[in-house]
Design a protein with these regions (language model features):
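Conserved beta-hairpin
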Residues: 95-142
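Short beta-strand segments
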Residues: 31, 122, 141-143, 166-168
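Phosphoinositide-dependent membrane-docking surfaces
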Residues: 131, 141-156
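N-terminal non-globular leader segments, chiefly Sec-dependent signal peptides
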Residues: 53-66, 90-102, 119
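N-terminal membrane-targeting/pre-transmembrane regions
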Residues: 2-68, 72-73
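A membrane-cytosol interface segment of integral membrane proteins
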Residues: 4, 156-192
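Hydrophobic alpha-helical transmembrane segments
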Residues: 57, 61, 70-91
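Generic beta-strand structural signal
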Residues: 126-128, 153-155, 162
Length: 192
């Protein structure tokens, strides 16, 4: 029996796109990072929004309402109205704490962290007075350092918040560890 030959498509030799980000156009360049921006990066960036304190607080409120409902029912089993209200509050708190990451992700999608088009690469430039975020399509956003309101940093990345759903995300893998620490210190100092 003769073997059937199948045609194979040639794989591209380089995953990199032909678009090159130009750092020359920025005056006072301090830091520059280019990275792939996909669902995983969006999920990591979203995890910085709101932190975990709100999730933990909603869980505590949920458990407190549940305990209070039990106390109310033990005190008077015919007093159903407060018990139902406490049960509803407990269920609401549980829903918030359970779906906290999905809520963060939806908020991130509707902010400047969301995808604009099909671009999968982002370029972040920090100068002496602003942070620029550009993508492969050439779209660029400028955030003044004077508007910097929050900086969330850990070993995985950094999220700078500028208010009005404007954020700049830099994963730590996009630059060397020493440059990343330097960037986080400089942004923390600019926020103060």
């Amino acid at each position: 029996m003769a073997k059937k030959k199948t045609a194979r498509k040639a794989r591209p030799t380089s995953v990199e796109t032909s678009y090159k980000f130009d750092d020359e156009k920025y005056e006072g360049l301090r830091f520059s990072a280019t990275y792939d921006y996909g669902e995983l990066a969006l999920s990591k960036a979203a995890s910085y929004l709101g932190g975990q304190k709100a999730r933990i607080a909603s869980f505590v409120v949920s458990m407190a309402c549940l305990a209070l409902m039990i106390v109310v029912l033990l005190a008077d089993s015919h007093n159903m109205a407060p018990a139902i209200v406490l049960l509803a509050l407990s269920m609401g708190g549980t829903a918030v704490s359970t779906n906290w990451h999905n809520m963060q992700l939806n908020y991130a999608r509707n902010s400047s962290l969301g995808f604009k088009g099909t671009s999968s690469r982002r370029h972040v430039v920090v100068t002496g007075d602003a942070v620029y975020v550009a993508d492969e399509s050439g779209a660029e956003e400028r955030y003044d350092l004077s508007d910097l309101r929050s900086v969330s940093v850990d070993d995985d990345g950094l999220l700078a918040g500028f208010g009005g759903r404007r954020y700049a995300y830099v994963p730590s893998a996009a630059m060397s560890a020493s440059r990343f620490r330097e960037l986080s210190r400089e942004l923390e100092a600019a926020r103060s």
